[in-house]
Amino acid sequence: GEKSLFFYGIVERLFSQVNIRSDFLTSEAFRNDPLFLRNQFEGEGTFQIPIVKKQHISLEQLKFIGYDHIKSDERENKDSVVHFFLDDYKFEVLWNHPEPRLEKLKQYKAVLTPQYSLYTEMPITLQIYNTFRNRWVGAYLQSNGIAVIPTMCWGEPQSFWFCFDGVEVGSFV
């Protein structure tokens, strides 16, 4: 009715301000979008945590650069490994909109998986979700030709049973 048209108009204006198509909200395309489903990678464990495949990456003379310091046209740090040991908000965009960041990340020797927080004060559900995000981004980057080194973390012993999921045995971590 009239109220739903009003609401739809507000939503359409909001999304036009952030460059999201409002027709995407009601379309079948959104429901089937891989960035919505996040199901394109093989999963492991009870929660189907995406698998970051083992890769051989030379660990000699590693240099690191924070994700917040990478450049579009890197010249001096191409042999560096990108890390995410930063506040989560500085790399949240990689989860929400990963594709536009690919070319920037491809310039570097390798990329660590993003270390989304697993604070002990967080509900276990959020810790599992952040572990899923860590591995999904790693699998996504690998599927786009980027060398990835998985990172792992845990809060308390209750997180041990899922924090290793999605990392192939024998991987450098």
Question: Which residues does each PLM region occupy?
Answer:
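Eukaryotic low-complexity, non-globular regulatory regions
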Residues: F7-T26, F30, F36
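Non-catalytic, usually N-terminal nucleic-acid engagement modules in DNA/RNA processing proteins
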Residues: S27-L102, M122
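Eukaryote-skewed repeat-based solenoidal scaffolds used as protein-protein interaction platforms
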Residues: E74, V82, L94-V173
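Polybasic, lysine-rich low-complexity intrinsically disordered segments
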Residues: K3-S4
